[in-house]
């Protein structure tokens, strides 16, 4: 199950100063509503270059019920029933309030280091006792929960375009630690990686082959909503969002994108087709050899020097046929 149609607004304000690059500060707000879970997501983000020279400070706040809308159980071997899903059998009711402060440091124009300190307040309920009984560590994380955390991220981006990459590489490494704090009774940690490569294969003129791998690992005893989740448009497109949860995950994706014609749809642009194949799995303390393949195809339109994209994907797995319409490529 997806979140359906998500409608929202994203106002932005930027103040420029010729002594500061690229600006003095930038503030953006957003508000969104998801049609299927019928929940909201609101937030505010700011980046300030005028407080500490050469060290931009960041601030964010959001309040949402959209982070975890369903819980399908722990591990690779859980059963899924589409009809039960449509009748809200797996539904969770979670509200998250989060505030963070941090900074960004550009080592070069291609490599950035970020640090954030974060406070969260959550309330999570699952009214289906059959689903709640599958939560590991004695349902750890249900009810009210507060946490503090510190995170460090390193991004290396050598792509030729952020919106329509055709060559180059992208790599992201992320570490986060949660110390003991109120309901968080255990120190736990999270490590995450995301690597991508783009090139133009000789066997198909003007095509783009995009390859991606991702992994995540938790260390220590963590609340169930901070498990490593796999499924949905971000990794396994032919499965519902956050279909599988575990102590770790690993996934691989491949996209072949082929332009087929120049076309005008209000503005001049390129029309193309794509095909994808991917697989992934989660890892728990009970070993298994189950992987979850997903494949599909789609059509895309790109315009305004590849900064405006509309992408349609249809995905197939042994559980579902999924459809996505987005304003960006999967990765």
Per-segment meaning from a language model:
Residues 27-33, 46, 57-75, 115-121, ...:
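Transmembrane beta-barrel strands of outer-membrane/channel proteins
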Residues 284-291:
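Small/polar, glycine/serine/threonine/aspartate-rich low-complexity segments that form flexible
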Residues 14-18, 30-36, 64-68, 122-124, ...:
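Sequence/structural signature of outer-membrane beta-barrel proteins
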Residues 43, 57, 72, 83-89, ...:
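C-terminal outer-membrane beta-barrel translocator/porin domains of Gram-negative envelope proteins
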Residues 10-12, 45-47, 102, 153-155, ...:
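Outer-membrane beta-barrel architecture
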Residues 269-274, 329-331:
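Flexible, glycine-rich linker and terminal segments associated
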Residues 15-17, 35, 50-52, 105-109, ...:
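Outer-membrane beta-barrel strand-turn architecture
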Residues 1-147, 151, 230, 243-245, ...:
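Gram-negative/organellar outer-membrane beta-barrel architecture
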């Amino acid at each position: 199950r997806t979140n359906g149609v998500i409608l929202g607004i994203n106002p932005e304000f930027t103040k420029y100063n010729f002594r500061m690059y690229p600006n003095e500060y930038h503030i953006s707000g957003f508000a969104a509503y998801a049609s299927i879970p019928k929940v909201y997501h609101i937030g505010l983000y700011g980046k300030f270059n005028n407080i500490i020279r050469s060290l931009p400070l960041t601030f964010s706040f959001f309040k949402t019920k959209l982070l975890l809308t369903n819980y399908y159980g722990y591990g690779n071997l859980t059963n899924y029933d589409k009809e039960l899903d449509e009748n809200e059998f797996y539904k969770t009711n979670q509200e998250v309030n989060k505030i963070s402060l941090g900074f960004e440091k550009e080592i070069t124009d291609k490599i950035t280091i970020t640090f954030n300190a974060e406070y969260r307040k959550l309330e999570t309920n699952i009214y289906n006792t059959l689903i709640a009984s599958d939560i590991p560590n004695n349902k750890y994380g249900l009810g009210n929960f507060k946490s503090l955390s510190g995170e460090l991220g390193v991004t290396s981006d050598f792509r030729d375009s952020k919106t329509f990459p055709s060559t180059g590489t992208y790599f992201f490494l992320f570490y986060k630690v949660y110390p003991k704090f109120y309901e968080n009774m255990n120190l736990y940690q999270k490590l995450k990686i995301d690597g991508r490569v783009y090139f133009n294969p000789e066997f198909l003129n003007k095509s783009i082959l995009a390859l991606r791998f991702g992994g995540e690992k938790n260390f220590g005893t963590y609340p169930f909503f901070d498990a490593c989740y796999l499924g949905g448009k971000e990794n396994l497109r032919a499965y519902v969002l956050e279909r599988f949860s575990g102590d770790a995950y690993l996934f691989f994706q491949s996209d072949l994108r082929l332009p087929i014609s120049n076309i005008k749809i209000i503005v001049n642009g390129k029309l193309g087709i794509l095909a994808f194949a991917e697989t992934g799995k989660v890892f728990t303390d009970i070993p298994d050899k189950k992987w979850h393949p997903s494949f599909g195809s789609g059509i895309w339109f790109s315009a305004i020097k590849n900064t405006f994209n509309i992408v349609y994907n249809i995905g197939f797995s042994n559980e579902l046929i999924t459809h996505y319409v987005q304003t960006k490529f999967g990765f």
